[in-house]
Each structure stands twice: as C-alpha cells, then as structure tokens.
Amino acid sequence: MTSATIPGLDTAPTEHEGLLAWVREVAELTQPDRVVFTDGSEEECARLTEQLCEAGTFQKLNEEKKPNSYLALSDPSDVARVESRTYICSEREIDAGPTNNWMDPAEMRGIMTDLYRGSMRGRTMYVVPFCMGPLEAEDPKLGVEITDSEYVVVSMRTMTRMGQAALDKMGTDGFFVKALHSLGAPLEPGEKDVPWPCNDTKYITHFPETREIWSYGSGYGGNALLGKKCYSLRIASAMAHDEGWLAEHMLILKLISPENKAYFIAAAFPSACGKTNLAMLQPTIPGWRAETVGDDIAWMRFGKDGRLYAVNPEFGFFGVAPGTNWSSNPNAMKTIEAGNTVFTNVAKTDDGDVWWEGLEGEPDHLIDWKGNDYILRETETKAAHPNSRYCTPISQCPTLAPEWDDPQGVPISAILFGGRRKTTVPLITQARDWQHGVFIGATLGSEQTAAAEGKVGTVRRDPMAMLPFLGYNVGDYFQHWIDIGKNADESKMPAVFFVNWFRRGDDGRFLWPGFGENSRVLKWAIERIEHKADGRSTPIGIVPTAQDLDLEGLDVDPEDVDAALAVKPEEWRQELPLIEEWFEFVGEKLPTGIRDEFDALKHRLAEEA
C-alpha cells in the first residue's frame, strides 16, 4: 500500500509541509489501515474510549464511584519503564555518557526501520499534535506523536495540551519534536486483537541532535506516552543544555505563609520517594497553606529579573497508585475521585471500583492486575502491580495553584534534592552555596524502587533524580548546572536543600512522621531564605537542631527528631568511597567544581575525627 491509497492521509487539517511529509513517510513504512489526525475533542475521546472498551483494553468502572473512569490491565511483561532498552543515540558516544545506553544512530535507525516496516498493519495510525507547557508561552515546545495505540491517544489528551490548538500553533513551518511510537503488533486480515498489544522486542530511542524519539514494542506509559519522560526530560534536557535552561525531574510546590507570602519550591526525588505527596502537601502548621503547580517535571528558565522561573510542562498526573490513600495524600484521592481517570494495573472490586495496596478498606474479594480472582490475606502476591498508575487531569486537583498554567512560570525560591535513605542523610541540610548544592544533587543516592527495572532496596546514585532521564553526558549535565549558577546573580538563585524523610532508627522505625508534617521542615527552609532561622554548621552543610524546627503540636519523641537530624561523621566517612566510586563511573567529564566540593567534604570530615 502506498501513502496515496491509505485513507485519511489526504484530509490533514494542516498545511505544515514538514509534518505532512513525515506522516506520509511513516505511513508508507508502517502500513496502517487508515490515518487519523486527532483534534483532542470530547467527542473524539468518547469514541476512542468506547473502542477501547469494545477491544477489552478498558473496563468501565462504577459510574457513581469513579465517573467516566476506566481500568486497563497490561500484558504482564509490559509494566514499567525499560531502562535496559532505552537509548540515547547521539552522534558521538561520549555525548551519551556512561549513564545511558548508546548505539550509533545510523545503526539504530536501520534496526528500528526494519521493526517499523508493516508494524501498524491492521491498525489505525494516529497523528497526535501536542504542546508541553502552556500554548501561550514565548517559546512553546511542540511535538507530534504518531502512534497505533488508542490507549496512548486518550492518555496523551490527559497528560499534554493535545489536539488542534497545538497543531495550529505549529503554523505551516514551526519546529516540532518528532515522536514515533508503534506497539509492534500488526494484525493480519481477520486476526483477533488482544486487550494489551505489545511486542517482546522493545526499544525506546532518543536522537538528541535531531530532537526525535522512536519507541517500539511497549504500550506502557513511560515508554509510550512520548511527551512524558522521553520529551519532557531526555530530549528537553538536551534542548536546555543548548539553550541555557534546566529541564528537571521535579515537583513544583507553592507554600503560603501566615503573612500570605507565597514561596515556590522545586524538588527532585527519584520515583516513589514521595514527590506527588509533597506536591499535594497539606501543611499541619497553623496558618500555612500549600498549592500544587506540578508533581513530576519542572522546566526552569531565567526571567527578566534574573530569577529562575519554573513551568510544569504537563497537563495531568501519571501517579503511582500503591501507597496513595486518604491519609498519605488526600488531595490525590480527591483528584482521582473527581473521575475522568484511567487506572492501569490496579485491582478491581466486585462493585466496579478500584483498589490497591495501601488504600483504606480491604475487600474480601478482588480481581487482581493480572485479571485473576484474588482473596486478600490468602496470598503474598500483590493485588495491584507495585508500579500501577492513575492518569488524571491536573485541573481536578483541589489544591491547584492559579499560576499552574502561567506561561511565564513561577519564581523558584528553593530547590530540594531528596532520596530514600535509611541512614546517614539528615532530615534536612542546607547547601553552603550554589556549587555545593550542585554537588549535593550530583551525589544523590536512593534505594531502588519498583518504578524501574532492577533489584528493589539497593542504593543507587541518582543525580538530581535524573539518572534514567538524562539526554546527554552526566558530566556535561553537572557542568551545565554549575554554569547556570556562574552566569547568574547568586543572590537571586534558589537556595538548595537536601532532605530525607525516610531515615530509620536502630529498631527500623521511621524517625520522622513525614507527609503533612514535612511542612515543618519546609518552614525552616523558608525561614533560612528569609534569614529568620538558625542552623548549625556541619561537615555536610547547615543542619537545624530540633529547637530550630517548629514542632508545636507534634506528638513525636524528641529523641527521634534529634536522631533524624543527626550528622554522624563516621557514617559519612563510609559514604566517601561510594561517592568516589560514583565519580569514577562518571569519568573524565566530572567537573573540577564537583571534585573540589568532594575534597572539601573529605577535609571537613577529617577535622571532625
């Protein structure tokens, strides 16, 4: 079949020649039955969800409990990002760096072109125009995803500003990121489809110089919703490096003091370390309020006043379900309860609602994420997959900040780095200056979670929580962070803090209650910015004492707070060779400034001996 005979190609609602040529090229290669240009309308979404229900991909949930919401159960082999099959195919291997898989781009294009050949046969090819961040931005970042997955189209409508408005923004010659996705599951005439088509062979490939994404074989969110990690972090980080800004794996939180002064905080935590919970914080300190700007990604650019301004490029939440409940994150629950949500790989109750581990109430009987009968307490397996998700519109969040859609972004007062560490790292530490803050982010370590492949529980270095998402060499990335500070007025730069909500006592208990009580820790950070709070100088930075924190009304053992804030030089001396090992892995591109900070830390720890 030539492109001339594929229905839908001749009715494109655009005169963008570059886009039309690409669509024709992909259609000729992948051989779909038809081509559809998506418009993002309610009618289109309703039509696609009906199709997905008929195909068995979606199960309609109880309309009274979860209005206009659906459950999808994936193939058991397609449940998470596949870091082992994710590539940065820069022209030079050194530009991908040691943290990324690399292949020569010409070789990769050859392999994937062969895989794409005929891969959409029997399916519809959707052309999905989208914008990351507000459409009215000075420099809107546009993209087009071509996909053969209705699940992807529906999810992209939730997660991005998708449809005709984005297409119109491109005009006749505007630049856009090309994002090509195929499930790799062609259908022969008369062949019955499966509810979750995918392929055992998977590639998620990025070409940073040409700003292209090619994904094959997976229908799962992070591998298939190409506006998310692929564009917003991997390709955008390469763009940011070239253009002098930052594309980061960070939530954006608005904290409002009793004096009604607003502070915006960006925070980088690895997956499943409480990012969404903090983004939707409910402060427990009287008079303080919090609002949400974003829960996962922040793009930070300098404003005309010399400060860093952040936008959330996303339009929805793609959150981890297990552990989300009315106690840990009531605002996430309210967002989900409002409806219009797609759940993936959670369990289903007998009355057509959803359930996952950590949710209040334990039904006697469930259908688990594999579609099997499940009796709680009779098995050690999980009813919901540990990386099961909800995909829901950000506009439904009850604590959404009015500035969330501001094309200028919001001015960032503080940047937090944090991971999941049982020992060593105190509840909060303030960096001495910008470069010291970059060192803290560059050496961030966290225990492995279920959001990625690999052994759960082992500590891995996750610089700025960007390890799986860097679009270029990690050493160049650290230098870019240092340069961002060098080229700015440091007095206008955000203060940098290092937090750890997860420290445990010798008996294995969490020392800090976390969740809403984290507002007490953030209050200290804000007061440090305002020069109103004390802290003690330690070898690792400025750390508060228990007396420096507002603990009024908190029922917690004072000894636990002291232990959560403790800086133990002997533990940090054990950390030094692990950092050294990490730097050896980073290799020759490790910036001198980072090495200088490490040497200074060693010196300060030696003085504590």
UniProtKB/Swiss-Prot annotation:
Q: Does the keyword Ribonucleoprotein apply?
A: no
Could you identify this protein by its name? Answer: Phosphoenolpyruvate carboxykinase [GTP]
| Entry similarity comment | Belongs to the phosphoenolpyruvate carboxykinase [GTP] family.
What is the uppermost EC class here? lyase
Assembly, per entry: Monomer.
Q: Which GO terms describe its biological process?
A: cellular response to glucose stimulus; gluconeogenesis; glycerol biosynthetic process from pyruvate; oxaloacetate metabolic process; propionate catabolic process; response to lipid; response to starvation
NCBIfam families under this entry? Answer: PRK04210.1
